[in-house]
Design a protein with these regions (language model features):
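Short glycine-rich anion-binding loops that position phosphate/pyrophosphate groups of nucleotides
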Residues: 52-53, 118-124, 168-170
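N-terminal small/polar loop signature for handling phosphorylated ligands or for N-terminal nucleophile
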Residues: 71-135
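Short glycine/serine/threonine-rich phosphate/pyrophosphate-binding segments
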Residues: 23-24, 56-57, 121-125, 174
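A general structural motif
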Residues: 64-69, 91-98, 142-151
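Short, glycine/charged-enriched hinge/interface segments at domain edges or termini
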Residues: 1-87
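Short beta-strand segments
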Residues: 16, 47-50, 115-116, 144, ...
């Protein structure tokens, strides 16, 4: 026998503001007959892999690598509050194409551009120079961590638009997403800061 009000009492808080909705919250909403709640819309992320060596094929020659970073970030979209759009692969000579993609992003509903690779100091690492050609309100490149040292972050002046340049190495890219991109997404949503481990 369950008595009326044994799950929740009248006026009791069900979910705090700035909480990521989880299945247990949906269970509570349905049990209480709550049909509508106010939520913030997901942010939109546009992702580019970079480099002549990147391949979407499963069978790759020795000098190429599989496009794993694209699939990793794509499959985080349900957990990390964003819509993922694959922008494709920017090859080593695609500086102008990348610049045009950023220009289009400024007029679109894209909130964040993420690139993977081409952020270090190599001959074909064009991402930093292209990004710095725009007017920026915030910018940093390289941090004292491993893996992930060559990460880049930029915010376009006068716009709520950001660009992250992640390293091409899969482990470095995953680490930088977790410790830089994800906290930025939390900041956008006004979520509480994570507690240290």
């Amino acid at each position: 026998v369950r008595f009326k009000g044994s799950d929740y009492k009248k006026g009791e808080l069900v979910v705090k503001k700035n909480t990521i909705i989880q299945p247990n919250h949906i269970l509570a909403f349905k049990s209480l007959g709550i049909k509508n709640i106010k939520v913030k819309k997901k942010i939109n992320i546009l992702f580019f892999s970079t480099g002549n060596e990147i391949s979407n094929s499963d069978n790759v020659p020795d000098w190429k690598v599989r496009n794993s970073n694209n699939h990793y970030i794509k499959n985080l979209d349900q957990n990390f509050l964003f819509n993922f759009k694959n922008g494709g692969i920017l090859r080593d000579n695609h500086e102008k194409l990348f610049k045009s993609k950023i220009t289009k992003m400024l007029k679109s509903n894209t909130d964040i551009i993420i690139t993977s690779g081409a952020v270090s100091a190599g001959k074909f690492d064009f991402v930093p120079s292209v990004i710095k050609s725009f007017q920026l309100s915030n910018y940093f490149k390289s941090v004292a961590i491993r893996p992930g040292k060559p990460i880049l972050f930029a915010k376009i002046r006068g716009k709520q638009k950001a660009i992250f340049g992640l390293p091409g190495n899969p482990m470095s890219s995953a680490a930088c997403f977790r410790f830089f991109v994800y906290p930025y997404i939390q900041y956008i949503f006004g979520l509480n800061e994570e507690k240290p481990f």
